[in-house]
């Protein structure tokens, strides 16, 4: 864990960090408010010394969309490339936002993932929609969305996703779900392989549970 937030590193400082082999085991790097522009962000994104980085805070810097995209690609590669032999990907409590899920949806290596856990992050139905629409998630059999504010809209997008047709286990505990979302699940043409469904901690009334009967 290295916190260098609120300093004046600029692009040159970012390049020094990117070229430092001593950071090869670093998992969390905080560089918010450091006047880092596109060249500095691209140096970090292309660094081979940050292969183990899981959390990167670059808020309030000066890079534009290309730099942001490159940094998202770095984080995505680092997260997914650590996929274990069981093909399970644990991305719990990593402060993932909608843009992070979009980056995941564009990464072809996601085709290898069989189990994906996204518990307690910061995305909503929009981020989930990006992921669910990706052809690269078609092999996922277990999906944990516990403690995310996806609501009925998120469940509807999930229910309408052909890429989710292999799902056997779905955890929707504490996801702000109501009976409207349950109806979407029950009527989904794609979620026919579900064997285990966790709906604990939601606002589902009697009518909602009847939809599942």
Q: Model-derived features: where do they sit?
A:
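Conserved hydrophobic beta-strand positions in leucine-rich repeat
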Residues: 2-4, 26-31, 56-58, 89-94, ...
């Amino acid at each position: 864990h290295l916190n260098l937030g609120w300093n004046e590193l600029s692009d040159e400082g970012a390049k020094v960090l990117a070229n430092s082999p001593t950071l090869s085991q670093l998992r969390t790097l905080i560089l918010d408010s450091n006047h880092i522009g596109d060249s500095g962000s691209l140096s970090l994104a292309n660094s081979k010394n940050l292969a183990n980085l899981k959390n990167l805070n670059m808020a309030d810097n000066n890079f534009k969309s290309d730099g942001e995209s490159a940094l998202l690609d770095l984080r995505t590669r680092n997260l997914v490339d650590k996929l274990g032999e069981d093909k399970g990907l644990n991305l719990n409590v990593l402060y993932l936002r909608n843009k992070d899920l979009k980056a995941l949806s564009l990464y072809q290596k996601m085709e290898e993932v069989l189990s994906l856990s996204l518990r307690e992050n910061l995305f909503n139905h929009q981020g989930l929609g990006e992921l669910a629409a990706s052809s690269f998630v078609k092999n996922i059999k277990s999906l944990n969305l516990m403690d995310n504010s996806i609501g009925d809209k998120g469940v509807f997008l999930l229910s309408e996703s052909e890429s989710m047709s292999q799902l056997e286990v779905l955890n929707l505990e504490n996801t702000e779900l109501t009976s409207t979302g349950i109806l979407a699940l029950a009527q989904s043409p794609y979620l026919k392989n579900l064997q285990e469904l966790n709906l604990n901690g939601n606002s589902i009334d009697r009518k909602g549970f009847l939809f599942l009967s």
